[in-house]
């Protein structure tokens, strides 16, 4: 089972919150104190809460569930994308488009358009167009890929969303809440934990902390998927008796 230790979190700077004047009082239960005007997050809470979240994600993946990684802040986008790809899951790393979950029917049409354009770009269709038309379609393809590339193969709504930066991604969290999709989110001292099923109190700006969260969630999803594949293989009779 994937777990993260107190040492891992300390080394990554998970315990450093925001300046005290920007705090959200709802995060008080998770704050240890303050140092030099900066809130210090109590990792005695964060460690078990994050490990509980990882166990949940692993369980979702073990049932062929879809995990959607969400992190559109500059500090988070690259780590989110890499982690999602590494565990064969899905991501939104550029900008959360309103209705991405709650208006899935429309999003699905845009994904179909994206896939049509991808096909046209490789089957020679673009070559038969005028230079201007080909350029317009190329730009449309690039724009759609940037917005929807991480979810184009999701094939439906996710079973859980993992969010870096609760404040920044409040629209995604609200949409998930409306649809009853569980939310796992990293919540800094300046953010609200409302609407989050699995709260991970921690720094949501430091690159090392973000990579620790993202890579741990990816490892948990992979471990869960491995359990699923092992069960499937056993059912298919591929596992030899020792």
From Swiss-Prot:
Gene Ontology cellular-component annotations: cytosolic small ribosomal subunit
Annotated Gene3D superfamilies: Glucose-6-phosphate isomerase like protein, domain 1, Helix hairpin bin
One GO molecular-function entry: structural constituent of ribosome
Pfam families tied to this protein: Ribosomal_S2
Signal peptide as annotated in the record: none
SUPFAM superfamilies: Ribosomal protein S2
Single biological process term from Gene Ontology: translation
Superkingdom of origin organism: Bacteria
Keywords: Ribonucleoprotein, Ribosomal protein
InterPro entries registered for this protein in UniProt: Ribosomal_uS2 (IPR001865), Ribosomal_uS2_bac/mit/plastid (IPR005706), Ribosomal_uS2_CS (IPR018130), Ribosomal_uS2_flav_dom_sf (IPR023591)
Family: Belongs to the universal ribosomal protein uS2 family.
HAMAP family, alphabetized: Ribosomal_uS2_B (MF_00291_B)
Name of this protein: Small ribosomal subunit protein uS2
Species, as recorded: Shewanella loihica (strain ATCC BAA-1088 / PV-4)
